[in-house]
Design a protein with these regions (language model features):
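Small-residue-enriched segments and motifs
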Residues: 80, 112-115, 173, 196
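Conserved positions in beta-strands of structured domains
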Residues: 67, 81-83, 115-118, 176
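N-terminal Sec-pathway targeting helices
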Residues: 1-15
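C-terminal cap/linker of serine protease catalytic domains
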Residues: 15-43, 48-52, 56, 135-139, ...
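N-terminal activation segment of mature serine protease catalytic domains
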Residues: 23-88, 92-94, 100-101, 105, ...
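Active-site region of chymotrypsin-like
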Residues: 3, 7, 59-62, 66, ...
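Conserved active-site neighborhood of the chymotrypsin/trypsin-like protease fold
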Residues: 84-165, 182-183, 214
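Beta-rich catalytic cores
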Residues: 76, 124, 194
Length: 231
């Protein structure tokens, strides 16, 4: 009988000691030292999202919406990019017919005074100049073509007209492959975003987007654009 009591007492004492050790030493230790990898992963995701949001905000006012009514009554919509603060805009030649009613949407304002300065069917680029308030004409920087990397994170921004009113739209992806003549992304989009600029995550211009019949987004590279506009 005495032996059983001693056994119970010893078990009780060991249990108390284990409880004190866990409560006073182990538990505070794990509270003070949380699982760092999980927190680091969350911080990386938050930082990446913040970088994209900042880049979008940086380039938003440089993106131009284009809406044309042709002589035959057809409506054509697309986008372009402001390249100088005196009103130079570059977009795709296929967007601008030689005749029609043209309207350019810049930072929420409609501009109808313009002049086509240069057109190149081979590169599918057109340069025009609009008359607008200088404060409304904001530009983005040009990305160095030689620094573009496979797998690099990129985004496009364009203007769509779902109900005749312009709305800016963003989509993101990566550089799938590239040559001197084009940059292929993994982005798929509607052809209403034809002419939309492609940017890197710094908000620098990489090219202007052509969207094929399957929705694949391919950009005319910045090297061809700069050579065409002379900048």
């Amino acid at each position: 009988m005495l032996k059983n009591i001693l056994k119970i007492l010893i078990i009780f004492l060991f249990g108390m000691a284990g409880g004190i050790f866990a409560g006073q030493i182990l538990w505070p230790y794990y509270i003070e030292r949380p699982l760092a990898p999980v927190i680091e992963k969350k911080e990386i995701i938050i930082q990446e999202n913040t970088v994209l949001q900042e880049a979008v905000k940086k380039v938003e006012k440089s993106v131009v919406g284009i809406r044309i009514k042709t002589a035959g009554g057809k409506i054509i919509t697309g986008s372009g990019i402001i390249v100088t603060t005196d009103g130079l805009i570059v977009t795709l030649s296929e967007l601008l017919p030689k005749a029609g009613d043209f309207a350019f949407f810049i930072d929420g304002k409609t501009v109808v005074e313009y002049q086509i300065l240069k057109r190149d069917q081979k590169t599918n680029l057109v340069l025009l100049k609009v008359k607008a308030e200088k404060d409304d004409l904001q530009t983005s920087g040009f990305a160095p073509f030689e620094e573009i990397k496979l797998g690099e994170r990129v985004f496009l921004m364009g203007v769509i007209f779902p109900e005749s009113e312009p709305i800016k739209m963003v989509n993101e992806g990566i550089v799938k492959y590239l040559t001197e003549d084009y940059i292929r992304t993994n982005i798929f989009e509607n052809n209403t975003l034809t002419g939309s600029p492609l940017f890197n995550i710094k908000g620098e211009l990489l090219g202007l987007n052509i969207i094929d019949s399957q929705g694949r987004v391919t950009a005319i590279p910045i090297t061809q654009i700069r050579q065409f506009i002379g900048l």
